[in-house]
Amino acid sequence: MATQRLPRIAFLPGEGVGPEVVAQARRVLCALRGPGFDFEALDAPANAVGALATDAWGEPLPPATLALAQSADAVLFGSVGDPRHDHLPVHLRPERAILGLRRGLGLYASLRHIAITGPLETANLPTSMPGQ
């Protein structure tokens, strides 16, 4: 019987608050390890994406970073962006890394968790349906 491969998670911290957020999310994932849950971590270098990648490699999403993400089952992505790069042509700005990842992974949107509380919970529910 073949052993099943562990799910692979690529960690791309980026810059700004990204490294802090990804580090804490990783701590949570590591704390959850046990029977029934484990993973293989794929660590990208600190300058693998965003402004740091543009500074080091001349582009916000180097091919090696995209290849790492494509080899993973999931990507934990921090953040990118640096106002010092606002003068660059659009294709070299750090934020282009997000679009490159979406395109390279066949995705169309970023998922962001939100919580709706209080009066907003029912704010978008119609009080009557059209035609009734």
Question: Where are the model-predicted features located?
Answer:
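The conserved SAM/SAH-binding core of class I Rossmann-like methyltransferase domains
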Residues: 42
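Short, solvent-exposed amphipathic alpha-helical segments in soluble enzyme
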Residues: 26-29
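Anion-binding alpha/beta catalytic cores of soluble intermediary-metabolism enzymes, centered on
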Residues: 2-19, 23, 34-38, 46-132
